[in-house]
Swiss-Prot record:
GO-annotated biological processes: translation
Protein name, UniProt field: Small ribosomal subunit protein uS17
NCBIfam families per the UniProt record, alphabetical: PRK05610.1, uS17_bact
Annotated function: One of the primary rRNA binding proteins, it binds specifically to the 5'-end of 16S ribosomal RNA.
A GO CC term assigned to this protein in UniProt: cytosolic small ribosomal subunit
Matches recorded under PANTHER family: 40S RIBOSOMAL PROTEIN S11 FAMILY MEMBER, SMALL RIBOSOMAL SUBUNIT PROTEIN US17M
Key words of the record: Ribonucleoprotein, Ribosomal protein, RNA-binding, rRNA-binding
Gene Ontology terms, MF aspect: rRNA binding; structural constituent of ribosome
Entry's transmembrane regions: none
Record InterPro entries: NA-bd_OB-fold (IPR012340), Ribosomal_uS17 (IPR000266), Ribosomal_uS17_bact/chlr (IPR019984)
Length: 89
């Protein structure tokens, strides 16, 4: 079995903040490229995540790094680790 001393690696992704209208929560759009199984062309796929922003520091357009956490609510199980770049005002 696995020891409790081993630290589990947490999933970390980068994305763009598309909404900060909720209190202490931001919506992050994460885009990735996947190869089409038949035609081989790379296509964009995206997903929206709800992330915890304790300081309400993020604004729309910011690029942020988020990491997975234990669920905080029905849809929120990510946390903003850092703001990689600010949006141009």
């Amino acid at each position: 079995m696995s020891d409790n001393n081993e630290k589990q690696t947490l999933r970390t992704v980068e994305g763009r903040v598309v909404s900060n209208k909720m209190d202490k929560t931001v919506t992050v759009l994460v885009e990735r490229q996947v190869k089409h199984p038949l035609y081989g062309k790379y296509i964009k796929r995206s997903s929206k995540l709800h992330a915890h922003d304790a300081d309400n520091a993020c604004n729309e357009g910011d690029v942020v790094r988020v990491t997975e956490i234990a669920p905080m609510s029905k849809t929120k199980n990510w946390r903003v680790v850092e703001i990689v770049s600010r949006a141009a005002v």
